[in-house]
């Protein structure tokens, strides 16, 4: 009876995995180290309406995915990343929004002996409030201290753990005595799957403006190289045409070659006084515009002054 129930449960789990991959085009592969059942329940609640969390044994998840490769061969890309204590978070929504929800669900946690430090831990210089009888803890970790007003004072900031270090019993005890909870635990995103593509979660931090700037810089570099080596490309074509047109104008200006676009510059070369006349004609127009603006401002100030005088309040009213 137990075997039948277990077989039925496995079949149900495989069906659930297949249904989720068919329904949701996107998912996160998440690490669940140090995440307790209560925290996991809170995460599921926070994702309600945004995503679905699926946990399970790696062998079962791999087997379910392999059994579904005939219908969706792209899922094979997930298999190398199913290792360690991992699960899936499925979503149809915005990946960055779901990622932010997962980050918000992280909780502070004390250091436990045997845990692996995910980040550097530094004990700041401070008066600990602990009595001299606790000095041995600090000495065991080579932390410089002094006794100040009957309590232990840490003289300098002290790095106590580096990323990847195993937390020892002394470090855990000392951090707990100082009420320092250095770690935060939650579902850590390791890979992102989106409609057959799998990529690092850092890609989600790239904004459209970043892509646009990179693209424009790439086009500019391509155009510069193309112009330098004389190899025409779509990026360099506008610059090549502009440079060619300038060369044509230069040739027309120094020869008898005639074409419509060169007519104006040839006239100016023949009679520079026309250019002076044109410049002189544009100057009064600009001056008249500025004078009109000043006149309008003066009228406005005068109108405001009259309104202030007519407010109807005398000094002794």
Curated annotation (Swiss-Prot):
MF terms (GO), sorted A to Z: large ribosomal subunit rRNA binding; structural constituent of ribosome
UniProt region (Disordered), positions on chain: 286-317
Bias (Basic and acidic residues) ranges: 292-302
InterPro entries with a match to the protein in the record: Ribosomal_protein_uL10, Ribosomal_uL10, Ribosomal_uL10-like_insert, Ribosomal_uL10-like_insert_sf, Ribosomal_uL10-like_sf, uL10_eukaryotes
Keywords, ordered alphabetically: Phosphoprotein, Ribonucleoprotein, Ribosomal protein
Gene Ontology CC terms: cytosolic large ribosomal subunit
Pfam families documented for this protein: Ribosomal_60s, Ribosomal_L10, RL10P_insert
An example Gene Ontology biological process: ribosomal large subunit assembly
Protein's UniProt keywords contain Cell cycle: no
Listed Gene3D superfamilies: 3.30.70.1730, 3.90.105.20
Domain of life: Eukaryota
Post-translational modification: Phosphorylated.
Subunit structure: P0 forms a pentameric complex by interaction with dimers of P1 and P2.
Family recorded in the similarity comment: Belongs to the universal ribosomal protein uL10 family.
Physiological role: Ribosomal protein P0 is the functional equivalent of E.coli protein L10.
Entries under PANTHER family matching the protein: 60S ACIDIC RIBOSOMAL PROTEIN P0 (PTHR45699), LARGE RIBOSOMAL SUBUNIT PROTEIN UL10 (PTHR45699:SF3)
Name this protein carries in UniProt: Large ribosomal subunit protein uL10
Organism: Ceratitis capitata
Upper classification of the organism: Eukaryota, Metazoa, Ecdysozoa, Arthropoda, Hexapoda
């Amino acid at each position: 009876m137990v075997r039948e129930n277990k077989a039925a449960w496995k079949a149900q789990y495989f069906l659930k995995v297949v249904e989720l991959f068919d329904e949701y085009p996107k998912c996160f592969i998440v690490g669940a180290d140090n995440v307790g059942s209560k925290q996991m329940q809170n995460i599921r609640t926070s994702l309600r309406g945004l995503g679905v969390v699926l946990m399970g044994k790696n062998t079962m998840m791999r087997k379910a995915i392999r059994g579904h490769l005939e219908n969706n061969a792209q899922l094979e890309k997930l298999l190398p990343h199913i290792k360690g204590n991992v699960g899936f978070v499925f979503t149809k929504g915005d990946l960055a929004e779901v990622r932010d929800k997962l980050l918000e669900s992280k909780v502070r946690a004390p250091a436990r002996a045997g845990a692996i430090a995910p980040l550097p831990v530094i004990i700041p210089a401070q008066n600990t409030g602990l009595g001299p009888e606790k000095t041995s803890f600090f000495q065991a970790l080579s932390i410089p201290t002094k006794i100040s007003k009957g309590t232990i004072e840490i003289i300098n900031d002290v790095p106590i753990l580096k990323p990847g270090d195993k937390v020892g019993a002394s470090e855990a005890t000392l951090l707990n005595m100082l009420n320092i909870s250095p770690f935060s635990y939650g579902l850590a995103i390791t890979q992102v799957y989106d409609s057959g593509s799998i990529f690092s979660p850092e890609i989600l931090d790239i904004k459209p403006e970043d892509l646009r700037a990179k693209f424009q810089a790439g086009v500019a570099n391509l155009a510069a190289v193309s112009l330098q080596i004389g190899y025409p490309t779509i990026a360099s074509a506008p610059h090549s045409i502009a440079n060619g047109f300038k060369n044509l104008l230069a040739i027309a200006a120094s020869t008898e070659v005639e074409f419509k676009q060169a007519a104006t510059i040839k006239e100016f070369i023949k009679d520079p006084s026309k250019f002076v006349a044109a410049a002189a004609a544009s100057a009064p127009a600009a001056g008249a515009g500025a004078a009109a603006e000043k006149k309008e401002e003066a009228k406005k100030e005068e109108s405001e002054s009259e309104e202030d005088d007519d407010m109807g309040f005398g000094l002794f009213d």
